[in-house]
Amino acid sequence: MSDPQAFIFFGASGSGKGTQAKLLLEYLEKKNRKAIHIETGQKVREFIASDDSYTSVLTKHVIDHGGLLPVFVPIWLWTEVLNKDFTGKEDLILDGVCRRVPEAPVLDSVMKFYKLQKPIVISLNVSDKWAEERLKSRGRTDDVAKYVKSRLDWFKKDVVPAIE
């Protein structure tokens, strides 16, 4: 197997990051490459559903009200997966990481620490209208219509600067 590769997906809520990441995972598996797919949003939903800690209660409240989580929560969730599951032999597919500027140096340090020096960044650019339609059709509990606009707005305000 060649050296592990990191793939980092960026895009607004509803842009199709998860769909594209899953397609990439299937492709890599067909090529007999092991990969770990870390989908931050899914990790947040799993944490809320499986934990009754004060942190999970607060996290649920923020998500249910269309808010943006504090920087440490998503970092903790995706670094926990790396610590537990990553052996250095798998490709990494990261979906929904680095949602704010303070997360960028953490992600950069992860890439350096694991010697993933040339991550492939995939940025999915879709219109707000397209993303809104997709979010409404998913039926997730966090895709409440009144919070969709705020999520798309904070993508522009917080995520785009983190990407740059």
Protein language model regions, located:
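Glycine-rich phosphate-binding loop of ATP-dependent small-molecule kinases
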Residues: 1-164
